[in-house]
Amino acid sequence: MATYLIGDVHGCYDELIALLHQVEFTPGSDTLWLTGDLVARGPGSLEVLRYVKSLGDCVRLVLGNHDLHLLAVFAGISRNKPKDRLTPLLEAPDADELLNWLRRQPLLQVDEEKKLVMAHAGITPQWDLQTAKDCARDVEAVLSSDSYPFFLDAMYGDMPNNWTPELTGLARLRFITNAFTRMRYCFPNGQLDMYSKESPENAPAPLKPWFAIPGPVSEAYSIVFGHWASLEGKGTPEGIYGLDTGCCWGGDLTCLRWEDKRYFVQPSNRHLDSGKGEAVNA
């Protein structure tokens, strides 16, 4: 019985299946953790959702910002962008079933036995684990309710960017969503910066990657995250694992086997078209 953690799939179905074959993943015996952003950019978002849903209890995933955006498109709130390649999914006969399943997935996974925490973008250093759990449940409850379109319409925006327990209503939900699914950089006090996307060596002072600021969760747990492909899985402190290595951009799909901390990679079937800045089929 092994635990396999895989970075952002982004609709790269063929690479996902090849990677699972490579590690000899056995449903029903092994457990698969996925860092979110299952969909968008790659050609197989529909196939990815169908497959992951079929795995049932042997998969543990978290929602990413692209998954939430898909739900907003599905709800008629956001525009379906051609570059996301979501039309086959949105027009599939089982789209309602798949997307109603997706919106009931969590923002946070915790394994107390392994002392392991997973969230798409990471865990803000302003939170302890109980706060993170409570905040995740706040958003999950709204997403799984009939009023989820109202939340999806209000989730876009960069403010507020500083946590306080006194936050309420949509402002609270927006901060939580940004912290779990969009965060990269923080100010030294843990306040989120939602604008900078540079690599850490080029980030303007005084910004630091969220994982470079000590926090209660990172001091007691290992943290697995995705979201930040330009890190290429490098530069994180001990116990912090960034697994998004840009498969949809022509990079790799990366897997970490938890028990022995061994990495496996599956090269993308796509290459970067430097003229367009987009990955195309190889």
From Swiss-Prot:
Keywords: Hydrolase. It holds the Pfam family Metallophos. InterPro entries: ApaH (IPR004617), Calcineurin-like_PHP_ApaH (IPR004843), Metallo-depent_PP-like (IPR029052). One of its GO terms (molecular function) is bis(5'-nucleosyl)-tetraphosphatase (symmetrical) activity. It catalyses: P(1),P(4)-bis(5'-adenosyl) tetraphosphate + H2O = 2 ADP + 2 H(+). Its EC number is 3.6.1.41. CDD domains: MPP_ApaH. The keyword Secreted does not apply. It comes from the Bacteria. Hydrolyzes diadenosine 5',5'''-P1,P4-tetraphosphate to yield ADP. HAMAP family: ApaH. Belongs to the Ap4A hydrolase family. This is Bis(5'-nucleosyl)-tetraphosphatase, symmetrical. It comes from Citrobacter koseri (strain ATCC BAA-895 / CDC 4225-83 / SGSC4696). The lineage of its organism: Bacteria, Pseudomonadati, Pseudomonadota, Gammaproteobacteria, Enterobacterales. The gene is apaH.
